[in-house]
UniProtKB/Swiss-Prot annotation:
The lineage of its organism: Bacteria, Pseudomonadati, Pseudomonadota, Alphaproteobacteria, Rickettsiales. This is Proline--tRNA ligase. Keywords: Aminoacyl-tRNA synthetase, ATP-binding, Cytoplasm, Ligase, Nucleotide-binding, Protein biosynthesis. It comes from the Bacteria. It catalyses: tRNA(Pro) + L-proline + ATP = L-prolyl-tRNA(Pro) + AMP + diphosphate.
Length: 432
């Protein structure tokens, strides 16, 4: 992709309304543009990141046998009335009437609708288990939307819902999804801690939140240092992991502790996922019954699994940035390589840049080729800001000797490489 043809509205000045680093960098790098309080347009660069996060999430859901569906963002209110949740959400839920005076709502979540889909189609234990997920925009009318897409009113979520014959099987499915979430965050290039949580308005009695560790996080979390090994070893047995949590009754006032218990780490975290074992709350309220092996009608056991995809875009930035800008993990980067031609009037620079761009593209490595006439300092600032994991820099002096520079955005290390070797060099970088 030629930068001269791309739509990248870079902001030179730091936006005054932005309070957290992710919001500042998303606005400055041309990822998003504010339309109203808590509402943003995702511009080309930001949308590429969003799609890449979606693909990582989708891949891990498919690996555990979850099936993708797409439910409407507008839901009939009668389902929420039937489940008993219609009044609970209060003013956060956007409600309205259609021309026939039917009450509708912009869905903040989908437990009620997925239960309706299940009860109308599945009647026997022989059709279980089932695990359905969708990726859809949601709306909650936050009283004080803030922090950009981190706490917006409109947001993109992945919601999954599992259905099992009994509690034992439901917990087994829950554990598989727990591991799928750990794999997802590993593939996204972030370190996430699973925290025992309250089920809140969803209901149920087993729940975990997943927090990305970031210095700018809103939440303070305390966790066993053994959780750090999950980043590279996500296949550890879930039952073993459960032994790392404190007992439910083991609570401490951190202000009264003279020192932390041995092996406990304190960090800031950003919640990006939440999973719940719901049980039969919705199936009882909405009459989602199945015939068991003895022909008896019983309520199906359910669990719910959410990941905030648009929130993840901001959280990943919070955990991967420096004073110059974003440092994208390769798996979600909008472009894997920034190809920077320092002199578009030098024939050798143009020749090497065009050749490198073509060959990288043939290897399905996404490249943003800076063919603009901007000054070198301006080009470096732009590409450090947008955060491509690698920069290939082509200047007249080294180009004359068929040499290009490769910069690792994360480490800042520069390396001279002969141009005929650059493609293989890039291909051999594991994270690309």
């Amino acid at each position: 992709m030629l930068l001269s043809k791309y739509f990248l509205p870079i902001l030179k000045e730091e936006p005054s309304e932005a309070k957290v680093i992710s919001h500042k960098l998303m606005l400055r790098s041309g990822m998003i543009m504010k339309q109203a309080a808590g509402l943003y347009t995702w511009l080309p660069l930001g949308l590429k990141v969003l799609k890449n996060i979606e693909n990582v999430v989708r891949s891990n859901m498919n690996k555990v046998g979850a099936l993708e569906v797409l439910m409407p963002c507008i839901q009939p209110a009668h389902l929420w009335i039937e489940s008993g949740r219609f009044e609970h959400y209060g003013k956060e839920m956007l409600k309205f009437q259609d021309r026939h005076d039917n009450t509708l709502l912009f869905g903040p979540t989908n437990e009620d609708m997925i239960t309706d889909i299940f009860r109308r189609n599945i009647k026997s234990y022989k059709d279980l288990p089932k695990n359905l997920y969708h990726i859809q925009w949601k709306f909650r009318d936050e009283i004080r939307p803030r922090f950009g897409v981190m706490r917006g009113r409109e947001f993109l979520m992945k919601d999954a819902y599992s259905f099992d014959i009994n509690q034992k099987n439901a917990v087994n499915t829950y554990n598989k999804m727990y591991k799928a979430y750990m794999n997802t965050f590993r593939d996204l290039g972030v370190f996430a801690i699973p925290v025992i949580a309250d089920n809140g308005p969803i209901g149920g009695n087993l729940s975990h939140e997943f927090h990305i560790v970031a210095e700018t996080g809103e939440s303070t979390i305390y966790y066993d240092k053994r959780f750090k090994i999950l980043k590279d070893n996500p296949d550890i047995d879930v039952e073993e992991i459960k032994g790392w949590y404190a007992a439910a009754e083991e609570k401490h006032d951190v202000n009264k502790l003279s020192s932390f218990p041995e092996g406990i780490t304190r960090s800031k975290g950003i919640e990006v996922g939440h999973i719940f074992y719901i049980g039969s709350k919705y199936s009882v309220n909405m009459n989602a019954l199945i015939n068991d092996e003895y022909g008896k009608l019983i309520p199906v056991e359910m669990s719910s699994y959410g990941i905030g995809i648009s929130r993840l875009a901001a959280a990943i930035i919070e955990a991967n940035c420096d004073k110059k800008g974003i440092i994208w993990p390769c798996s979600v980067a909008p472009f894997k390589v920034s190809l920077i031609n320092l002199n578009i009037h030098d024939n050798k620079c143009v020749e090497l840049a065009a050749k490198t761009d073509k060959e990288l593209s043939h290897q399905n490595i996404e490249v943003l080729y800076d063919d603009t006439d901007a000054r070198p300092g301006s080009k470096f600032a732009t590409h450090d800001l947008i955060g491509s994991p690698y920069q290939i820099i082509i200047g007249p002096k080294k180009a004359a000797n068929n040499i290009v520079e490769l910069k690792d955005r994360k480490t800042g290390v520069l390396e001279d490489i002969e141009v005929e070797n650059i493609i293989n060099y890039i291909k051999n970088i594991d994270s690309i």
